[in-house]
Amino acid sequence: EALYAPFARSRDKMIVMDVRSAEMTKYAANCMLATKISFINEVANICERVGADVGAVRRGIGADHRIGHHFIYPGMGYGGSCFPKDVKALITTARDSGYDPELIAAVDAVNHRQKQVLGRKIADYFAGRGGLDGRVLALWGLAFKANTDDMREAASLEIIRELTAAGMAVKAFDPVAGSRARRLLGDHPRVRICESQYEPLEGADALAIVTDWNQFRNPDFGRIRKLLKIPAIFDGRNLYDAELAAGMGFDYFSIGRAAAAPSREKST
């Protein structure tokens, strides 16, 4: 305590415990946060099937002070260097100790499945349009979250792997992670890392949003529609209002909300 005293003026923020408990605290904290993420994603997937809006559900449960709004944003699952590693480490530690951590294992399994959700929506959409082979996807976002270039365990990698294996080409842009992406994916024959936000859309068949960068939140929808061959947006971060997107002529798909499409009725 004396060693840390100059750096810990608020005594309530410093807790002294044994080494094993300290290690367990670190793992448990990250697993708790990961659990909240997997939980809201599980709820989002149920919402889609029963006609509920996960955004409304999130606001409702978050209003309960015992739950709060932190870490209950539906999307593409967690990634990066901490949550995946610590969740897996606690699962392994538990099993090595003779205990089956069913809940934590489910958190990991749900997260892995969530990274495939957007890719499946894209595959389903094009299934009735001749399939994915020869199609081009514009991808916004490569990092596992905004404000970093970290692509470890990023959902973008799972989407790229799945769709390119089915014959789709991917043109991607990320404001920060471009250089890292070139090192990871530069030799991939079906992947091109672009230099600017709208470059991937030129001649693409659809747009997918994977990372919630601020610059993706208010794009030029008219420009997007003009550049895309098919006006389809797959929003893995729920950045846009579904009715607004449909009103501008887009087929719009998000997480935990009903798909939206422009009216096909002819005006009189």
What is each of the regions a protein language model found here?
Residues 1-268:
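Structural/interface elements that position substrates and couple domains in central-metabolism enzymes
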